[in-house]
Regions:
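Pocket-lining segment of extracytoplasmic ligand-binding domains
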Residues: 68-70, 78-177
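Paired acidic/hydrophobic, glycine-rich loop segments that form the ligand-binding mouth/hinge
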Residues: 26-31, 48, 131-136
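An extracytoplasmic/periplasmic, membrane-proximal ligand-sensing/linker region
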Residues: 163-165, 169-230
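Hydrophobic residues within well-ordered alpha-helices
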Residues: 20-21, 75, 125-126, 182
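Extracytoplasmic small-molecule ligand-binding "clamshell" domains
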Residues: 1-32
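Hydrophobic/proline-rich hinge and linker segments of small-molecule sensing/allosteric domains
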Residues: 48-71, 168-171
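Alpha-helix capping/helix-boundary segments
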Residues: 15, 34-35, 139-140, 215
Length: 230
């Protein structure tokens, strides 16, 4: 785009939402639920512009090191780890799908823990701190590829249905011409060009596609049913 970019690190999901709302950030990479929180906090002005093609069909993986666990029903009476409480793929959507399968984590599991991060969930399960856990598929694949998880010990036993997840969101009061420029720059990224592929590889993206607010209505409904949104 030719624009100067200043990277602003944030401490957690809530800080990203607040920074967008208070105009400290113009553009942010958000999980689906964090986007919904940003939309609510900014009175509907935060705009999702693009997502990776993979984010339109995102999934989470349920993992275990316990040979007795083969299905979600086997989780009854077991210890379980989610990621961060407000993580779309590490907590909210897996919880929603568990409930659709008739499982209430707080009632049906022996204990429920929050590891705080996807890779930490794998560590919990590998170390026996939890009988099973759930994390986003992208992180699981990355850990497997980099041999940071022993797949002879920790294995996937279930996968969620697909849902929309991560996106790049802009604050809505940015100049529309700048928003269009940013969106077009993402959509123009071509993996056949090495300099473009280097950028895309950082986000494990095969390509970027346009997205819109209504794609996240399902996540908003899941957040309300979980009591995480008013």
């Amino acid at each position: 785009t030719g624009m100067k970019v200043v990277f602003t690190p944030v401490s957690d999901y809530a800080a990203v939402v607040e920074s967008l709302a208070t105009k400290k950030l113009d553009l942010a990479w958000l999980g689906g639920f964090t986007y919904v929180q940003a939309k609510i906090r900014t009175n509907g002005t935060a705009i999702p512009i693009v997502q990776r093609a993979e984010d339109a069909v995102f999934t989470s993986k349920f993992i275990t090191a316990d040979p007795a666990i083969k299905t979600l029903a086997d989780l009854k009476g077991k210890t379980f780890a989610f990621g961060a409480p407000s993580s779309t793929s590490g907590s909210l959507m897996p919880r929603f799908f568990l409930q659709q399968d008739g499982l209430n984590p707080e009632k049906d599991f022996k204990t429920v823990a929050y590891s705080g991060a996807h890779d930490a969930t794998v560590a919990f399960v590998a170390a026996g701190k939890a009988d099973a856990g759930v994390l986003n598929t992208s992180v699981w694949d990355k850990l497997v590829e980099s041999k940071k998880v022993d797949t002879s010990k920790v294995r996937v036993f279930a996968t969620t249905p697909t849902y929309f997840d991560y996106n790049w969101t802009v604050r809505g009061d940015l100049d529309p011409a700048i928003i269009k420029k940013l969106k077009d720059a993402f959509l123009a990224l071509d993996p056949s060009k090495p300099e473009h592929k280097a950028i895309m590889d950082l986000q494990r993206a095969s390509k970027f596609v346009a997205t819109e607010s209504k794609n996240y209505d399902g996540i908003e409904a899941a957040g309300k049913s979980a009591g995480l949104l008013k």
